[in-house]
Amino acid sequence: MTHVGFLPEIPTSTEYYSLITALRDLAEYIKGNGQYFLFETGQETPVTLKRVIEDVGTGNLGINLDPANLILYGMGNPIDALDVFGEYVRGVHAKDGFYPTDSKKLGKQVPLGEGKVNFPLFMKKLKEVGYTGVITIEREIRGEQQTKDILAAKKLLETLM
């Protein structure tokens, strides 16, 4: 699983073609080992991410859906994103946040249930698209508050499953 960086939005560009070629080489190599390559959501639109996966076309690419990253980067609503690329979701982060309000900064991560991700609807939508995998709680702070937030997130998620 990785953040590849910013994916080119224009599929006819030289940069896009070069990216697809490099990703295809990598994906074919790791496919020989029975491995998958997952893109973590964030810096690109859901449509661009789906296009890249389909254009590489090796069958072993997927998505780790971090709903907060889509919001933090201002790239879309994670529930709507599932309509676009739900079939490719192979992992999920439980993380919450707010859209950016300062054009020079990312949005703000907050404890699960306190941001813009509608987790009751998000969890329902995950089931609708057939996701049955792991949900990993992610809280990018340190110390005692991180532990408290993770335990609260676990409790919230248990009520939604």
List where the protein language model places each region.
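Active-site acidic/histidine proton-transfer and metal-coordination neighborhood
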Residues: 1-62
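Gly/Pro-rich active-site loop or hairpin
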Residues: 69-132, 141-144, 148
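A short, structure-level motif marking secondary-structure boundaries and short turns
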Residues: 10-12, 34, 66-67, 106-109, ...
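Active-site beta-loop-alpha junctions enriched in small/polar residues
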Residues: 4-5, 35, 40-44, 68-70, ...
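Conserved, mostly hydrophobic/aromatic
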Residues: 19, 37, 66, 92, ...
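C-terminal helical cap(s) of enzyme catalytic domains, especially alpha/beta-barrels
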Residues: 146-161
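A structural motif corresponding to the C-terminal end of an alpha-helix
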Residues: 25-37, 122-132, 160
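Amphipathic, non-transmembrane alpha-helical secondary structure
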Residues: 17-24, 28, 47-50, 54, ...
